[in-house]
């Protein structure tokens, strides 16, 4: 862009829309995953088995599924901004209340309600990105937003470990819930629903962007029939099945990595810092894969290769035996490859579906993935209770990722014009 038309950094849509969305999802992801660091202490203090912890963790995803399609529909036809604002307030309050659970039933109910209010956030944000970024930008835009996932883990695990060490697991939930209540006000002030509504956007940038987005919408065509037909669109069904298989493995690994490392004899603070390594590598992979995907305007094979490699690395983790370094290396490679898929993966449904129904399709895809998320943590916990190790669980997780890659192969991506 020429110097005469360059806009101020604080008005740049990449910083404003994606920056605020990034922080929002960091807070969301910390509040949903910090329980992974608290599991060893909660099991000891509350007397809860690994399988029960896994079941309670899985209940988060049952709640998460409920609002996927309704939130996606509301984001498409009403307001993604307002839906996310409400969800942000509610999930922060529920996360705060986790500090006060005393029984298995209370923990299970708390995780379900937390999932209910976090459920629509990703779906609504993907719809918001669809309203703000062109097809040529979308994998990178999705990645800037979704890189919040590994960054949240990099931040949360060490911080959670330090708070746990000095103040206990209850204070960890309190300290990490409060920022969400404050950030809700920032979200309401900073975000505009569309470029047309953004008073802070440079007029020339606004005109150019609106023209490009309208041209892409025209190319995608109008939705055919009732929006509910989107639920059995071939690409939506294949992506939903793929995401189920992928997230079953990913969430199983994510929630139990701290426990796997803790069982090698490490302190909780050391576990917190080491558990930050896999998502840090994942953040780098997300950037590299997103740039490649946008440069080549190719989504499907970037997604498939990353997912298959992640499965292979999980299978290879069996070679590490009881070596802390070996386990960490293979889990880091697996998580890094898996996170690399996110940018192209979430660009696909916005490119194969008309804008008016994209939110519904994204909701189903995300909901199916998080149904897999109910299975993964529970299955890993059951295997740990029955066998005394996570070996079988990692094997099944690796196979699930490879099967997911095969499921995605028939998807047809629309050629870039």
Name each model-derived stretch.
Residues 35-36, 229-286, 342, 346, ...:
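Extracytoplasmic gate region of multi-pass secondary transporters
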Residues 66-105:
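Conserved MFS/SLC helix-loop-helix module at the cytosolic interface between two early adjacent transmembrane helices
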Residues 67-79, 285-298:
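Helix-to-loop junctions at the C-terminal end of transmembrane segments
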Residues 90, 94-97, 105-113, 326-333:
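Paired small-residue
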Residues 110-148:
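Cytoplasmic helix-loop-helix junction between adjacent transmembrane helices
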Residues 145-198:
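Helix-loop-helix hairpin linking two adjacent transmembrane segments in secondary transporters
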